[in-house]
Design a protein with these regions (language model features):
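An N-terminal assembly and electron-transfer interface module characteristic of large anaerobic redox
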Residues: 1-225
Length: 225
């Protein structure tokens, strides 16, 4: 069976991979080895064996670049020894993207799955990493709104007017609070619902809204508005 080694220091991505593997094992077309880079693993024979056992290696990292000791060594090892990988490293002033044997149309769709988020999109990401089919035969990402206003029950509205018509009071002032989109997707909305009730109790419209930080037209992420 094919194996994907997913190396990341991004907490939400790690959660999505874990949940995809735990929830939908029957949908996955290969095995997943997850390496949490929040604390870089020791580079030893065991780690190299994990690299060698993987048919595909995907690396996502935020905060330090490929000039950091571990990532520099990883990039050099993959370049010398591995047939298929994709490294996407973001640091404050630049982004480094390196890859081998992943065509641009496949990278764009894999990135779209990853950035759109959601457990099923990570199932598609895992399967897409293994796939030899043309992307015309791949599934599109689930259409999860990039920005929305949350209602009392955790439901969402695409516009302010939609929210006001359904749950708002036109004669009240409004208080807006931003939260992260991935929190809504994962159902981590306890504090958002508590804020909603507290703001509403004082007769203000609670505009509890999420968005996606940073636009990316290449994969359809709009500017927040």
């Amino acid at each position: 069976m094919s194996r994907l080694l997913y190396i990341s220091n991004l907490g939400k991505q790690i959660q999505y991979i874990e949940k995809a593997v735990a929830t939908y094992p029957e949908l996955l077309q290969g095995e997943v080895d997850l390496c949490n880079m929040k604390k870089p693993p020791q580079w030893d024979a065991d780690f190299e064996s994990r690299l060698r056992a993987a048919d595909v290696v995907l690396v996502t990292n935020m905060g330090v670049g490929l000039d950091s000791p571990f990532l520099e060594r990883l990039e050099r090892w993959l370049y010398a020894h591995h047939p298929k990988y994709w490294i996407d490293v973001v640091e404050p002033k630049k982004t480094d993207i390196l890859y081998r044997n992943l065509d641009e149309d496949k990278r764009i769709l894999l990135e779209s799955y990853r950035r759109t988020s959601g457990v099923m999109n990570y199932v598609r990401l895992i399967n897409g990493a293994f796939s030899t089919k043309p992307t015309s035969e791949w599934e599109e990402p689930d259409p999860i709104p990039w920005q929305a206003i949350m209602g009392r029950e955790g439901n969402i509205y695409k516009t302010y007017d939609e929210f006001m018509d359904a749950e708002g009071h036109r004669d009240w002032s409004s208080i807006a609070v931003y939260f992260y989109r991935d929190e809504w997707i994962m159902g981590d909305i306890e504090y958002q619902q508590a804020l909603f009730e507290e703001i509403y109790k004082h007769q203000y419209n609670p505009i509890i809204f999420y968005g996606q930080y940073g636009s990316n037209p290449r994969v359809g992420i709009p500017n927040m508005k």
